[in-house]
Amino acid sequence: MGCRDILLTFSVALLLISLFQIWLFREGRQVPELSDDQLGKDRNTLMTSKNKNKNEDVQRLFQRYFKGRSFGLNNTNSRFEDSNRRIPSSPDRLHN
C-alpha cells in the first residue's frame, strides 16, 4: 500500500498546483483593447505604423543575425566564403 499512498499524494499535489496556477492566471491583469471611438480617424495610420515598425524590426534583426548577407533563392553566389574554407594539406584524415 505504500506505492498507492505515494501515488495518491502526488496526484493531489499535482491537482493543487494546477488549481493554484489557474487561480493565479485568472487574477492576472488584462490589457483593454482600444475601441473605434478611442482610435478615431487615425486608426489606419496607427495600424500601418505598427506594421511598418514590425517590418523594420524584422529587417534589423535579419541584418544583425546574417551580417548583411543575402540568401535569395536565385542567388548565384556561393554560400560559403572562400576565406573561411579549409583545404586539406595531406591525404591523412587524422591530421586534417
UniProtKB/Swiss-Prot annotation:
Transmembrane segments: none annotated. The gene is CLE43. This is CLAVATA3/ESR (CLE)-related protein 43. GO terms for molecular function: receptor serine/threonine kinase binding. The modification Hydroxyproline is found at residues 88, 91. Residues 1-28 form the signal peptide. Residues 71-96 are annotated as: Disordered. It comes from the Eukaryota. Glycans are attached at residues 74, 91. InterPro entries: CLE27/CLE43 (IPR040274). Keywords: Developmental protein, Differentiation, Glycoprotein, Hydroxylation, Secreted, Signal. Belongs to the CLV3/ESR signal peptide family. One of its GO terms (biological process) is cell-cell signaling involved in cell fate commitment. One of its GO terms (cellular component) is apoplast.
